[in-house]
Amino acid sequence: GDTVTDRSVGPAQWGRFLCTVFDEWVRHDVGEMFVQHFDAALAAWVGHPPGLCTFAPVCGAAVVLEHNGDLYSCDHFVEPDHYLGNITATPLAELVGSAQQQRFGQDKRATLPRFCRECPVRFACHGGCPRNRFATTPDGEPGLNYLCEGYRTFFGHINLPMRIMADLLRQGRYADEVMAILAQEKQGETQEPVKIG
């Protein structure tokens, strides 16, 4: 929901957590351990769809079906306003393709505050999950993702390694080569240059 409690992770904490885990992963585990947020980020740097609705430009592809046949727009929105119908009465494809569901999906992009639309990491974030858009922007516009500060920190932090991995992939090489590149850079060594676009 839109309530922050003493048990909620703070935006800055979330960003530090993601950065800390990423730093460990990018130096030791690329190609061995797959972290959904990192895979989605790499997809953004390569220019592919994220594979994670949180970071997609629009929502609506991940409906939720209840045991009684009730269908809702998303698992974060199992509530009356987002009830699409019941599959025992209406075909699933019709409900998923309904104007209501299409509007739900497009609203993710259409309701982005200006702060988000002008953000340098929008290509990777797209405002995050609409369920978390209950904060206000620095200029007071509603609709900012509560975790924005953390995501901005994270996506800024991973920019160089992501660019390296994206360029490796574009060259037909493996993304896990980033581990050796970063290790050599840390030691001040040089190696075969990787074009970073």
Give the positions of each predicted feature.
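Acidic/polar loop patches that form or flank catalytic/metal-binding clefts of enzymes
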Residues: 30-37, 72, 104-105, 127-128
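Residues embedded in well-ordered secondary-structure elements
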Residues: 52-54, 108, 137
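Generic structural "secondary-structure junction" signal
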Residues: 55, 86-89, 94, 106, ...
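Radical SAM enzyme [4Fe-4S]-AdoMet core and its adjacent flexible, acidic
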Residues: 1-54, 58, 64, 76-87, ...
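Residue-level recognition of short, well-ordered coil/turn positions
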Residues: 29-30, 100, 173
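Membrane-interface junctions of multi-pass transporters
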Residues: 50, 78-121
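Radical SAM enzyme core and accessory elements
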Residues: 68-71, 79-82, 111-197
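Generic detector of well-ordered alpha-helical segments enriched in charged/polar residues
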Residues: 15, 19, 39, 43, ...
